[in-house]
């Protein structure tokens, strides 16, 4: 495989990819495992796929509740997202067990490390998807994901305060460990009826977003360009405003007010700026990194449904709901085409 393909699939600099014959696990495991010399076929970043599908399914569930979509469409999408999430969790357990050096490389890499946050985020979303069917297990998933995201934030975000971060690693992926995680936790707490905790998590996500935004945009403006094969991760820039607005709706009761309109307005601006960047992002064609757009697009759909439900800015509401849903479906079709061509998994 060429260096360009490796970069496209893993998001890592090819010079940072190593081959391991074997590794000895920590003494407390008292186990010696022979490692494959091949790359693990499922990159950590692929958790962004169920992340986007879960988020869209939950937006569609709200759309069904207000009579805009059939219930079966939302529940079918959520079931597909749950199945994909479960497969990826199993795959990552296998990676930890039998591809330990690659797992440790994920943990230590300044960029890939952030994708680990997608695991607790999708665990929370899986709990929300299952909540109408199995309340107790669903609550368990939500609490497990929330505890996991806080633990990882302590490791990842807290660890960066020692001055170990770099400018090149300051891309929108940095939002995941403290912004996306806390917004999703806020939504889940609100759904469970724990409103005070919802506001706590919303505050954690909101102020984390504000503290990171200027640094990330400054790096995108003045730093070296993001590598062409992984430019899709810049699409994560769409997420904070719309995901934060969704969390605010969950915590505040779902009504359109001035603060919600402020968030939607900023999200719309990010959408327009990212549209302008699409030709630059697509210089080397579509890659799975474009799933970085999916969380923001799915949340944009939900914001559109809220506008429609409240009969506010109806044209904008229908545009956000239609564009968000359609573009996530386009991502799904493009990904299925990669799979058909045998270009989805790392070889």
Identify what each model region corresponds to:
Residues 35-59, 74, 78-81, 100-127, ...:
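Juxtamembrane helix-loop boundaries in multi-pass membrane proteins
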Residues 60-73, 129-139, 187-199, 248-258, ...:
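Helix-coil boundary and interhelical linker segments in multi-pass alpha-helical membrane proteins
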Residues 76-87, 137-150, 198-209, 258-268:
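Structural signature of hydrophobic alpha-helical transmembrane segments
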Residues 87-98, 145-156, 209-216:
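Membrane-water interface of transmembrane alpha-helices
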Residues 155-156, 187, 211-220, 243-250, ...:
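Alpha-helical transmembrane segments in multipass membrane proteins, preferentially the mid-helix core
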Residues 203-263:
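Aromatic-anchored, glycine/proline-accented short structural segments
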